Amino acid sequence: MKTLVICSGGLDSVSLAHKVAAEHDLIGLISFDYGQRHRKELDFAARAATRLGVPHDLIDMRQIGAHLSGSALTDDVDVPDGHYAEDTMKITVVPNRNAIMLAIAFGIAAAKQADAVATAVHGGDHFIYPDCRPGFTQAFEAMQAQALDGYASVRLYTPFVHEPKSAIVTEGERHNTPFADTWSCYKGGEVHCGRCGTCVERREAFHLAGVADPTPYADPEFWRAAVEGR
């Protein structure tokens, strides 16, 4: 299955890229710059492509991202601390982000005669992000079947959509994903903050998977209180 992987440079998507490279025919990685404050993640995506020996396409969506206002990921709004399961994390939603990225990725995949677009949405995303839920991914794939009817047949590959993040860590370890060479933190500092939702979820996932976490955190113990306080 010739597959184009949407890769942010984070733990989930880099692990997915390594899984696809091992199990399918990885034809490239595609990343999106939508003006996110943690833009440094894109450097990790580029390194993953180099490591896996495939092209890396970086799509400039900054002009579009400027209009998707109100999110802590793109605007001058503080990224909240705590676990993803808290309502405060809804401020990190970028409206319709995945739908826009997937539409572009499907067009590129069709042009490249790929069989699939892969994205690393997972079960832990469902509470906060509606465009990571199975209902969305199924509907989007059905829509693309109509959009590309008679031109191309491209499926949406979402192997983690019903899985917790800890399962991604387990799968990533199985495929020798270099976890230290991934970036998750939404604050985009020198090291992972250890306090934002994605840092807490990352740290918890390694703990639940029983895999050593190689990530340096500015606050390495905050996650415990955040998880206990859910």
From Swiss-Prot:
Q: How is the cofactor bound?
A: Binds 1 zinc ion per subunit.
Q: Which cofactor does this sequence's record say it needs?
A: Zn(2+)
Which domain of life, per UniProt? Bacteria
- List the SUPFAM superfamilies: Adenine nucleotide alpha hydrolases-like
Annotated Zn(2+) binding sites? C185, C193, C196, C199
Q: Where is the signal peptide?
A: none
Q: A Gene Ontology biological process annotation?
A: queuosine biosynthetic process
What does the record give as EC number?
Answer: 6.3.4.20
Molecular function GO terms recorded: ATP binding; ligase activity, forming carbon-nitrogen bonds; zinc ion binding
Q: What class of enzyme is it?
A: ligase
- Entries under InterPro entries matching the protein: QueC (IPR018317), Rossmann-like_a/b/a_fold (IPR014729)
Q: Which reaction does it catalyse?
A: 7-carboxy-7-deazaguanine + NH4(+) + ATP = 7-cyano-7-deazaguanine + ADP + phosphate + H2O + H(+)
Q: Which UniProt keywords apply?
A: ATP-binding, Ligase, Metal-binding, Nucleotide-binding, Queuosine biosynthesis, Zinc
The pathway that the record names for this protein is: Purine metabolism; 7-cyano-7-deazaguanine biosynthesis
Annotated ATP binding lies at: C7, S8, G9, G10, L11, D12, S13, V14, S15, L16, A17
Protein family per UniProt: Belongs to the QueC family.
The protein's matches in PANTHER family, at most eight in alphabetical order, are given as: 7-CYANO-7-DEAZAGUANINE SYNTHASE
> What NCBIfam families does this protein map onto?
7-cyano-7-deazaguanine synthase QueC
User: What function does this protein fulfil?
Assistant: Catalyzes the ATP-dependent conversion of 7-carboxy-7-deazaguanine (CDG) to 7-cyano-7-deazaguanine (preQ(0)).
Q: Name the HAMAP family on file.
A: QueC
Output this protein's name.
7-cyano-7-deazaguanine synthase
Protein source organism? Ruegeria pomeroyi (strain ATCC 700808 / DSM 15171 / DSS-3)
